[in-house]
Each structure stands twice: as structure tokens, then as C-alpha cells.
Amino acid sequence: MIHVVAIITAKPGMREAILKEFRANVPAVHAEAGCIEYGPAVDADGMGAIQTPFGADTFVVIEKWESPQHLAAHAAAPHMKAYGAKVKD
């Protein structure tokens, strides 16, 4: 199993717009062969010193894939290219 933790930092004030596009793409990713887990996570407020905050413009993507080949296919998927085009700016 392949684990991926991707840290995404949006331009200031754009995190929610990026997350909206991300969440719209999640069903297509979940339907991919080899996808075990794929989803966004944002900082929880008020966790105290135990948490190192990423900031208001950042979120984390947690991914699990059956194999490196499945992850490579995911990266090349048409819906990922379309997502990338929507959020590149």
C-alpha cells in the first residue's frame, strides 16, 4: 500500500474555492482502480500547543493507493488533469 500526504497551499483567500473543486473531484477519484482513501483535511482550531497549524490557506490531502502503478494512473487520469486546470491560478 502507498500512503501519500500532500500539503496544498492556495493563494491567499482561495482555499475554500480550491476545496470546492477538490471535493467535486473526489467521487471520480474514489472510483479509480486501486484507490483506498482520498480526502482533504483542514486544521482544527483550538487544539493548543500539540498542533502546528498550517495556516488559513492550506489543507492536507490524505491518500492511500494499492500500488505505485495505481498512484501513477491516478496522476495521469483525465479528471485530475481537468481539476488541475481549474485550480492552477
Where are these regions (language model features)?
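Active-site-flanking beta-strand signature of metal-NTP-handling nucleotidyl enzymes
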Residues: 2-8
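Short, conserved charged micro-motifs
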Residues: 13-18
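Basic, Lys/Arg-enriched alpha-helical interface segments
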Residues: 21
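Short glycine-biased active-site loop of nucleotidyltransferases that positions the nucleotide triphosphate
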Residues: 49-54
